Amino acid sequence: MIKLTFNLIKGLDYKKLDKNYQAKLDEIFSQLKNKKTPSANMLGWIDYVDQDHTKIYKSIDNKITEWDKLKVTDVVVIGIGGSFTGIKAILDVVAYLPSEQKRQIHFIRSLSENSFLKILEEVKDKNWGIVVISKSGTTLEPSVGFKLFREALYKQYGEQAQKRIVAITDPKKGVLHDIAVKNKYEMLPIYSDIGGRFSTITPSGLLVAGLVGADYKQLIEGAKKAKADLFASSELKKNSAYTYAALRHYLYTEMKKDVEIAITYEEQHEYLMLQHRQLFGESEGKSLNSLFPTYSVFTTDLHSMGQLYQDGKKIFFETVFSFEKANKNKLKLKNSEFNNDDQLDYLTKKSVNQLNYVACEATKQAHASAGVPIIEIDVKENSAYGFGYLYFWLCVATSVSALLLGHDPYNQPGVENYKQRMFKLL
């Protein structure tokens, strides 16, 4: 499902990589398999994919059917961090074109008043509902968003608004849990042993994917396959996620590359790059010892950052993502109807996708010639199944990479720092 290529890393000795890392990777493999990592109580994402999801699927299908009967056309999804980025990444893969979207999704994912006003204006004359995602119900951003949008929903629908709210939260306790129980809102679980950035294909992502009309169950099937593949062996030659983690560590510690730039040539996959940034940034950004993950969308960013990437200080490496079935070569250029005044007839019969592919190949050659190490990650399916596979693959790679650095992949003390200071100021 995933092909990892790294022949554009000059000076890499694969035998040395294997010799230096295999024993460490074997140890990490055992830690993950036997739940012996730091914060081992947060490893629920590993076994979650193999659990019986029948009850959750039924609840999701029932809610979709109910909202179909109510003719709900728009959904406000309220969440932040892992409760936003991953869900948006799913939607952009499974329902990117307007014709693929059964419902319009609006995200509340910050404390931007203008964003709140914009979305309130967008839904005020629509038939809409709310999905609110918060484990505790006390995180300020989603709490404030839910307060404002719940008031607007009740103002429009009165007591009928109760059927138009789904709370995804801790199934046993918390402010949002108590609100849902009190008002008899549909409630789906956030699992206490799965952190936000590792929760994309739990009910929060599954429900929203289902609401737009995607085959959301395939997200789990793809992740199941990834687990079977990645927990079979820790050998570098057999485990691409472990190889990727080792390459990142090698480039950072041995080749002194401090920045990783995740790159896509499809705007459709920008939020996948953001998800990559969150997974690695939040899991590894500790103790003043980590790669700095960022991303670019090409060819757009070639016209803003391309100069820096080509001729700037080489403190970075690139990880280029591609999806084999992302494009269907539907848009082909024809002979000009205006006497070739645009001078593009030499491109006749070529598709826009082919042009994008050539741009990708040319850029890789140019950057590699300038000494930029390049890792390539090719995913075979641009689908719910493919997303599920890639997401689980990234979760494994993130965990291994953080553990190689000696970090706890599953905590985020720096985030808690700002929260404490914010509440103190309020």
Curated annotation (Swiss-Prot):
PANTHER family: GLUCOSE-6-PHOSPHATE ISOMERASE (PTHR11469:SF1). The active site is at residues 282, 303, 419. One of its GO terms (cellular component) is cytosol. The gene is pgi. Catalyzes the reversible isomerization of glucose-6-phosphate to fructose-6-phosphate. It is found in: Cytoplasm. It catalyses: alpha-D-glucose 6-phosphate = beta-D-fructose 6-phosphate. Transmembrane segments: none annotated. It holds the Pfam family PGI. GO terms for biological process: gluconeogenesis; glucose 6-phosphate metabolic process; glycolytic process. Coiled coil: none annotated. GO terms for molecular function: carbohydrate derivative binding; glucose-6-phosphate isomerase activity; monosaccharide binding. Pathway: Carbohydrate biosynthesis; gluconeogenesis; Carbohydrate degradation; glycolysis; D-glyceraldehyde 3-phosphate and glycerone phosphate from D-glucose: step 2/4. This is Glucose-6-phosphate isomerase. Keywords: Cytoplasm, Gluconeogenesis, Glycolysis, Isomerase. It comes from Mycoplasmoides gallisepticum (strain R(low / passage 15 / clone 2)) (Mycoplasma gallisepticum). Disulfide bonds: none annotated. Belongs to the GPI family. The keyword Oxidoreductase does not apply. Its main location: cytoplasm. Its EC number is 5.3.1.9.
